[in-house]
Design a protein with these regions (language model features):
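NAD(P)H-binding glycine-rich loop region in Rossmannoid oxidoreductase-like domains
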Residues: 1-33
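Glycine-rich NAD(P)-binding loop of the Rossmann-fold in SDR/ketoreductase-type enzymes
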Residues: 11, 25, 29-40, 83, ...
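Conserved Rossmann-fold NAD(P)-dependent oxidoreductase catalytic core, especially the SDR/UDP-sugar
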Residues: 12-14, 39-88
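A conserved pocket-lining segment of Rossmann-fold NAD(P)-dependent short-chain dehydrogenase/reductase
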Residues: 23-24, 82, 125-138, 146-170
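C-terminal substrate-binding subdomain of Rossmann-fold SDR/epimerase-dehydratase oxidoreductases
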Residues: 155, 160-162, 168-286
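Hydrophobic positions on the long internal alpha-helix
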Residues: 37, 41-45, 99-100, 178, ...
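The catalytic Tyr-centered alpha-helix of NAD(P)H-dependent dehydrogenases
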Residues: 74, 81, 85-92, 136, ...
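Active-site Tyr-X1-5-Lys
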Residues: 47, 71-72, 84-122, 152
Length: 286
């Protein structure tokens, strides 16, 4: 891991993780990737800051999975409300939020006193993410992108949560933009280390109806998985991102309709047509 820190590194964005459902199936691997590797990377970043006498900003993407029990309340949740993760993924995300904050506030301050260096830790807590280019695997919020991709491809969707289930979502480009905005914000503007961001928060039934408005023949086969449904029910139906708006100018962008019409549907169609073209153009070998 030391080889990652060559030259003078000022910003680390640590995206690697084993997601919620996959983490429940492979807990030891989830801990090694989500906790041990993250801790080691943070320590290396701090050592790099000390060695070069400058500040390293460490941006850590976290998740609504840190919330739990009674999180599905009628009001959008603040960052410190209903923290009781139901999954090991959520446990590791919360642990690293706290570990990074500790390093930033305690060890980082010690480095600064001695060398002028600092470890500047920032967390962006994502909702569910929707990508037009790839289908996610191993996440509990996967039902939404699976439904969208199936509708665009003219396929019947299978949904592992009931119609009333509800989670907040944002598109992948919006998540990337928000991450870079937090990364570039002056430290003096940040009043906390952990920031929630949100987008739109449809129920599964609302997502199904929006897709059927655009694809009249779209069908969904509901086959709720008890454990995955339980996880979704433990997460917030929406989040309060007023702190991100206040401190670094975050603004919610697309609603469900515009996310479908302006990004997801055309993007999935384009990716699907390219994939089909590549398959047709690939020469067959015997």
């Amino acid at each position: 891991m030391e080889s990652l820190f060559t030259g003078r590194i000022g910003l680390v964005i640590h995206l690697a993780a084993l997601l919620s459902s996959a983490g429940e199936q492979h807990p030891d691997l989830a801990w090694r990737i989500n906790a041990d590797a993250t801790w080691n990377l943070m320590r290396q970043a701090m050592s790099h800051a000390e060695a070069h006498g400058h500040t390293v900003r460490f941006v850590y993407p976290s998740s609504i999975a840190v919330h739990g029990r009674n999180a599905s309340q009628s009001h959008p949740l603040l960052e410190d409300e209903a923290i009781a993760p139901r999954t090991l993924y959520g446990v590791t995300k919360r642990a690293m939020e706290q570990a990074g904050t500790w390093l930033s506030e305690e060890c980082g301050r010690m480095l600064g006193q001695e060398t002028g260096a600092a470890f500047d830790f920032r967390t962006i807590r994502y909702p569910g993410l929707l990508s037009a280019e790839t289908l996610p695997t191993g996440g509990t919020s996967d039902y939404a992108p699976e439904m969208v991709h199936a509708a665009v491809r003219g396929e019947k969707a299978s949904c592992f949560v009931p119609p009333h289930a509800q989670l907040p979502f944002m598109t992948m480009p919006e998540a990337a933009e928000a991450t870079l905005a937090l990364a570039s914000a002056p430290r003096s503007c940040l009043q906390q280390n952990v920031y929630a961001v949100g987008g739109f928060a449809p129920t599964v039934a609302e997502l199904e109806n929006a897709l059927r408005d655009r694809f009249p023949n779209f069908e969904v086969d509901y086959d709720p998985h008890p454990f995955r449904s339980e996880i979704v029910d433990s997460w917030p139906a929406d989040v309060d991102d007023s702190a991100a708006q206040r401190d670094w100018g975050f603004q919610r962008g697309l609603d469900l309709g515009s996310a479908l019409d302006d990004y997801l549907i055309p993007g999935i169609r384009n990716a699907h047509s390219q994939s089909k073209y590549e398959c047709e153009e690939t020469p067959r070998t015997l």
